[in-house]
């Protein structure tokens, strides 16, 4: 026999005085993103903040503050547009986060979110949600002068195409972009028995080399015929873009042999387009052994508050150091305003920048040195094949423009278009250390980049034990933040949209949502005329 317990009876009358606020108080944690948005949504995202996106007359929109809150929650929970509006309608936490709306507050159609994204994209401040959240954190004193940089792979939302599919899809795209009259004219030039109206790979016995080669050549001839007919014409923007894409695809993947037959090129183009559906996507590598297709999401993080201070999305084949100046643009001194001869450090503390060896590029080091920043970016040591003498075994005197080898031979540096070179030549012939230095019959040569001095200074800095301790204690914090961004609950690494511009905006919105979740933990509150963090 179980212990005594009376039967619970379901209530048949609701509490007509209950609100989302009274219901959620005590149930929703105050340090959750829902609790923060409930308290501060009107201060963070006032309707006036979006006034420039709308007209002065016309049908009233859904309140912009509510849409902004839904967009933030949608991004941090990884919802589709339809899922987001459904949760706003039925999940009480979402209405609580939007200022404590009533249980019966009406929902809206998912196209409202599509429309708001389009309006933001067409505005002068497309990333204003991220900017406002970051500015709020700065006013609360949560953003210091240290930045950690890193990047992560973002997988594209399309299938990677092989050469045959790529060329055929580009032809199909060009025909589809043309007006009816021009399309009819171009179709009369096609030689293949293919109307190019359906997507997919053409029928062919791909195991037969001759048939496969004939298909590739026929596709190339169709592409040449179309491009030749359009050459020199006044084209619409859409047709011009489609023609440029077709020309790029054919040029990167096909080459004409001496017999006049087009074949698939036995090389990989440097900036190869991998899909006509998303022409901005590229093959990328985070390591030599791990590749991906799509984009890179770059972030700058404050390691003390663990807030994201900047984001940038690039094609997957762009190096990590290339967008670093953009990530630091708001933190580096403005060259136009720095004309008083007084260093930036006199106004505020010097900027400290941390990064792994991907950020140890000479051009970035030069930019940071000119900004008087403290550089904590790792630089790879020079290497040589088969364990031979590396560059650091040579004494390089940039002022005297000479290089001294381990055997004591001295040679002059000669200028190149992108740096300098020292060639030892005949001096290596009878050198007792030649076997440990070079296998070239022309002797050893040492090539210097245009930023050799910056690289040398960086290598000297990173030999300091204090530098190493600071680097090891600080840089890994960005890895944890990237882990937060790439959680499966937020949508993971797979891009939700197509095109670099849209993915950039989506990544910025995700960073804003993650920052808000972090600010909630730090206890962000609005106190009279300013912001403060009670738990920082």
Regions found by a protein language model. Give the residues of each.
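DNA-recognition alpha helix
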Residues: 84-96
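Helix-boundary capping/turn motifs
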Residues: 42-43, 60-64, 87
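Alpha-helical support elements that line or immediately flank enzyme active sites
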Residues: 66-78
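Short, hydrophobic/aliphatic alpha-helical segments
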Residues: 50, 91-92, 464
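A short glycine/serine-rich beta->alpha loop
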Residues: 53-60, 497-500
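Catalytic micro-motifs at enzyme active sites that drive phosphoryl/nucleotidyl and oxygen chemistry
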Residues: 59, 97-104
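Basic, low-complexity segments
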Residues: 1-57
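Anion-binding and metal-coordination hotspots
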Residues: 80-86, 101-102, 106, 111-536
